[in-house]
Amino acid sequence: MNTILTCQDEYFAGGLGYDCPYFSSTSASTVDVSKETWVSLWASGLLDNRSSNHGPHTQGQLYNMGNSLQEDYLFGDQLSSQISANKQLQDTLLQKEEELSRLHEENNKLKEFLNSAFVKTLAEKTKKLLHQNGQSSFCTNPNSRVPFSSNSTPGSKAKRARRNLYGELTACEAQSSPVVEKWVLQTLGLKDVDTIDDSALANYSAMSLQPKQDSPSSGYSSAHLTPGHSQAATSCSLSPSQCSSASLPESETASPLSSPTYHTPDVAPNKTEVAFSTSLHPHCNVKTHSFPQGQAFVRRDTQGGWKFTWVPKQSE
């Protein structure tokens, strides 16, 4: 029961790391270990073993706590970066929403402008102009339109349009111009309204058909005026009787032109007794003055003077 054990015994409760309160040189004969002493030593050894066994667990807990703090720090960094990215996305979204609202506002303004009366008026004017270009503005003739051809070029279309417009304009002018009788053309020495008759027959007929001496209109066949008095000859506006004879030369004051007497000759309208005394030439400029009593023809001669011919009105 009273077994003596040294402090260095490995089977002792304290083990190798146990602090022995006695010296190892103490012999068993000198030490009297009672039961109470052994119990007290054994209890103290248990307490020391418990404290030594709890040491490594505390270090592991500290290591785990450090790792958790590091992980929390890294997670906080990631969270802050995600928060900043989210904020940037929110700012971009706000900008896009503002731009979208501005585009909607501009679209509404454009719709209001297109629906305004000004644009509608312009559209109507454009339709009218296109309609006028499609149809003739001179003489509308639906039968004269050329059918559309898919293989026609723009140049041919433009030429065809010019030809159509020219033809319609010519037709309108031909319809609006009055019909000139043949005896009037022969009197003026013309083949037609736009052509001068230079044939010998026309010249001969104008020169040879002189009025008779007893004809009432024989005194009005021709009167020669110098260039200095040409303005006086063309200033007759109402009747030949208003033309003053004071502006004529002294050699021509006795001319019947100064005080004409109007008579109605008994000749047919197709006769040429009262025609020009000279023929017409391409370089001659003929001016016609119409009066209630008849017509006056004034033209420039080759010497620079003026030829005046009075044609009384013929009775029907």
UniProtKB/Swiss-Prot annotation:
Entry coiled-coil feature ranges: 82-117
- Ranges of biased composition (kind: Polar residues): 134-155, 207-234, 253-262
Where are the Phosphothreonine residues found in this chain?
153
Q: Which GO terms describe its biological process?
A: DNA replication initiation; negative regulation of cell cycle; negative regulation of DNA replication; regulation of DNA-templated DNA replication initiation
Comp. bias regions, Low complexity? 235-252
Q: Which UniProt keywords apply?
A: Cell cycle, Coiled coil, DNA replication, Nucleus, Phosphoprotein
- Tagged with keyword Cell division: no
The consequence of residue 226 to A is:
Abolishes phosphorylation by cdk2
Signal peptide location: none
Question: What is known about the tissue distribution of this protein?
Answer: Expressed in most tissues. Enriched in proliferating cells from skin and gut.
Q: Name one GO cellular component term.
A: nucleus
What GO terms are given for molecular function? chromatin binding
Q: Tell me where it resides.
A: Nucleus
Q: How is it modified after translation?
A: Highly phosphorylated by cdk2; stimulates initiation of DNA replication.
* Consequence when changing residue 153 to A: Can still be phosphorylated by cdk2 in vitro. Abolishes phosphorylation by cdk2
Q: Where is this region: Disordered?
A: 134-160, 207-269
Name the principal localization, coarsely classed: nucleus
The keyword Coiled coil appears for this protein:
yes
The family note in this entry says: Belongs to the GEMC1 family.
Task: Kindly state the subunit structure of this protein.
Answer: Interacts with topbp1. Interacts with Cdc45l and the kinase cdk2-cyclin-E (the interaction is direct).
Q: What does this protein do?
A: Regulator of DNA replication. Promotes initiation of chromosomal DNA replication by mediating topbp1- and cdk2-dependent recruitment of cdc45l onto replication origins.
PANTHER family linked to this entry: GEMININ (PTHR13372), GEMININ COILED-COIL DOMAIN-CONTAINING PROTEIN 1 (PTHR13372:SF2)
The protein here is known as Geminin coiled-coil domain-containing protein 1
State the taxonomy lineage. Answer: Eukaryota, Metazoa, Chordata, Craniata, Vertebrata
